């Protein structure tokens, strides 16, 4: 029982320690759901760490159980943790299916470690079985080992590539260089350009008087000092503010403890498009159209397309377009690049249907399968995956031949000279062959 609990605790820690991009999202969700401002994930990981430590003590001192504390208390806490483990992951995977895909991607990329342990364990187990069943079955030992060894030869781990190393995926900076400067500000956009990003990704909102500006959240509370400037309007939707009011806000002071961004204003779309033009970047955006009743609800798309047209960056702009809006977009902005968005749920559209509708780019969540990526590329579509922050995930997509990714970790990914632990197939065969010899020698010992 202690071993089972220990394995589950370590799996919990491994999953969340390698999933830094989603930690903040989960924590913000739990804060919103409970109304309590706390670092919930840190509490959960400390709990899992203590359970793992207590399990280690139980396993180490299992012959002297009294020294590990009351057995009934450990059992109660252990069972509670298992219920928490399966309950939390069930909710997570139902709410965000891409996290389940990510778990499989993580396993596949680092599978050589698992394969090695499994090969050695099965070789030892097979040896014991043959030894216990007499000499007539000893011939089964090399045959069984060969089968176990051959499976990964034909199905290698995700860090193994055949032929030449694919071209490094280009990078779109998510809300600018959002880990180095306040998100969706000119500072973050220019920082991303200076780092060498291929393009910028942002969120566009329209003010109460028709000015297009950058803002991701529905309200201004998280990324501005609206609570100090307009104390009674902290929770009001951003689209209810006029540009005069928005221009008085500080969108930089919230960013850590660095005074360098104090006074950074909320930028208008025109200013960001100027950064795109001056640095020869590509541009992709989410347009947040206000609900009915807003004075510019029906004009937001036209205003945005006109702004892009006037700025002369249409040929470098990816417009995320619903099929019903394609004609309107092509009429207003003929040079724009139509992008099809693929989210967490639903069946991805066929390559043929996207090409027929005039799309040139697929902008998908990173859970998209490698087979689907290649199918889109074979149809002439550019494939961009979002949001990719972890070096191993970027490496996986690099080896898969993805065209580009959208990331918060611009500086880290741009600095990578090659994929993490990337291994040519020939080198992999040498390594795997060496491990196979070790397994064979170990199993042959009497």
Language-model region placement:
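Catalytic cores of alpha/beta
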Residues: 329, 390-403
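His/Asp/Glu-enriched short active-site or ligand-binding loop at hydrolase and phosphoryl-transfer sites
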Residues: 316-324, 333-373, 380-390
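Membrane-interface segments at or immediately adjacent to transmembrane helices
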Residues: 157-214, 221-223, 248
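Conserved, mostly hydrophobic/aromatic
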Residues: 174, 192, 203, 246, ...
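Internal/C-terminal transmembrane anchor helices
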Residues: 133-158
